[in-house]
Structure formats: C-alpha cells, structure tokens
C-alpha cells in the first residue's frame, strides 16, 4: 500500500423529489509558478478550533452518511475513472467508494488537521493514493493531467468558486468529467432561501467557511465546463435545516 503526502513548494436539468501565507501553484513536477493571494479570510486552520472541527467531523456526518449520504457518494463516484483528483477530501469519507476504474487517485485538502485524519484513513484503507495539502483554487497539476475531478460538499467552503472551476477546467483533459455533489441555495422556496441568507454569516464562521446560500449550479453553468446532467433533491436526514437543497451532477470539459 502506497501513501504519499505532499505539500506545495512555492446539460440537462431534472428536478427530483489557513494557512496565513498565500499558496503557490506548482506543477506535478513540481516547479514553482508563482503565488496568489486568497481573497477571503476564514477561521484559522492552525487554531484549536480547526483541530476540534477535524476531530468531530466524522461524528457530525454520521447520521447523514447512514441515512443516504454514503449512497449518494457511492452512486456519484461509480462514474469516476482514470486519473482522478478529489477536491477538499476532508477526512476521506469518499475513499471506500472509488471504483477500480480509477487508475490513479490524488486527494487534495488544505486543512492540516483534516490531512492528518485523511492520512490515517488512507493507510487503513489499503489503497494507493497521493495526498496533497493544497487549496482547490490552486491545483498543483499541469493542464490536461486529470480525467476526473470530484467535489462532494466542497464548493460551499472554497473562497473563490469561479477560480476553483477555472482550475478544474484547466487540469481536466479534453472530455474529462467533473463530478459534483453540493448543498446549494434554494431555488424552489423563497422562505428557505431567505433563511439561508440570514444564517450564512454565522455558519461561515462556525463551519470552516461554509456558505449555505451559494448559487453553485449557476457558477458551474458560467464556468468553462459544459453541464452534462444535474438533478435536484434534498439532503438526507442529519443535514442542517438550511442545507437541505442539493444538486448532484456531471460537467465535462468540452473540445475547443
């Protein structure tokens, strides 16, 4: 079993029921290609708070996983293949769901406390993978190096979703797929949407940057990716009331 951890060096729509320093971009080699300031602040990843959040994350997700979250992961990740990159891998809850069609797996995660727990889960899993401590806005890969990118409950937390999706499009090979599972701002209930707007400032501080009112589907549609399929639904029991609206889908990097 091979476990590697590396830190950077420098459509269709169907409706159904901190690191304080900037992160450098590197290539897979790696070689330093500059750095970019992160646009928004969030609770420090090096604090006691960050350590506690990582410690209790799996417990907080337990009911959601049992009530259908694990099945959602499994069904989505069954479509992953080839060189696969996961954004915001957290503690590694997706690991057991990757199919044999995945020939090379890389897990990115910016939080050092999450990385520690991710490494332990990877070692226990017995699968071959590489862990890279890096944010989704600055992926350490050459253009066209990836066949599948995965994001499960990650785009709500990133500082700049437009930059993330631009990076996803950059690293994907032509025809490569972006598999996503995200909670989003409600489009069916104005009452729910207003509640999400009200709680977002507090939730963002309390849950490591999570924005319940993010219009993630619109962001994907405006990205360089081509939406192939998306379905709407509600998250399973165990999710918070303002996190119920959910999208699951696939986008593809089109031919130029």
Task: For the regions a language model picked out, list residue spans one by one.
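Conserved class I S-adenosyl-L-methionine
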Residues: 23-26, 31-82, 93-97, 114-117, ...
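C-terminal alpha-helical "lid/dimerization" subdomain adjacent to the S-adenosyl-L-methionine
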Residues: 44, 51, 56-66, 181-242
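Local beta-strand N-terminus motif with an aromatic residue
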Residues: 81, 146-147, 225
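Class I SAM-dependent methyltransferase SAM/SAH-binding core
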Residues: 85-138
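A short acidic, Gly/Pro-enriched loop at the edge of an enzyme's catalytic core
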Residues: 137-149
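A short SAM/SAH-binding and catalytic strip from SAM-dependent methyltransferases
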Residues: 147-160
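A short glycine-rich, Lys/Arg-flanked "PGG" loop and its adjoining helix->strand segment in the class I
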Residues: 162-174
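C-terminal lobe and adjacent flexible extensions of AdoMet/dcAdoMet transferase-like proteins
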Residues: 246-256
């Amino acid at each position: 079993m091979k476990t590697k951890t590396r830190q950077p060096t420098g459509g269709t729509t169907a409706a159904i029921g901190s690191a304080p320093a900037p992160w450098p971009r590197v290539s897979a080699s790696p070689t330093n290609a500059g750095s970019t300031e992160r646009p928004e602040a969030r609770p420090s990843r090096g604090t006691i708070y960050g350590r506690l959040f990582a410690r209790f994350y799996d417990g907080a997700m337990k009911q959601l996983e049992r009530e259908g979250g694990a099945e959602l992961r499994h069904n989505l990740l069954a479509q992953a293949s080839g060189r696969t990159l996961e954004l915001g891998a957290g503690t590694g809850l997706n690991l057991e769901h990757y199919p044999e069609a995945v020939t090379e797996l890389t897990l990115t995660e910016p939080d050092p406390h999450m990385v520690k727990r991710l490494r332990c889960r990877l070692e226990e899993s017995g699968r071959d993978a590489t862990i890279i401590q890096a944010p989704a806005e600055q992926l350490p890969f050459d253009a066209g190096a990836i066949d599948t990118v995965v994001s499960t409950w990650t785009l709500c937390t990133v500082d700049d979703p437009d930059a993330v999706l631009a990076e996803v499009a950059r690293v994907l090979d032509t025809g490569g797929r972006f598999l996503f599972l995200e909670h989003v701002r409600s489009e069916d209930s104005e009452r729910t949407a207003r509640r999400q707007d009200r709680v977002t400032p507090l939730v963002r501080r309390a849950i490591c940057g999570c924005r319940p009112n993010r219009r993630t589907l619109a962001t994907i549609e405006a990205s360089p990716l081509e939406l192939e399929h998306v379905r709407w639904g509600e998250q399973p029991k165990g999710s918070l009331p303002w996190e119920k609206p959910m999208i699951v889908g696939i986008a593809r990097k089109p031919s130029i």
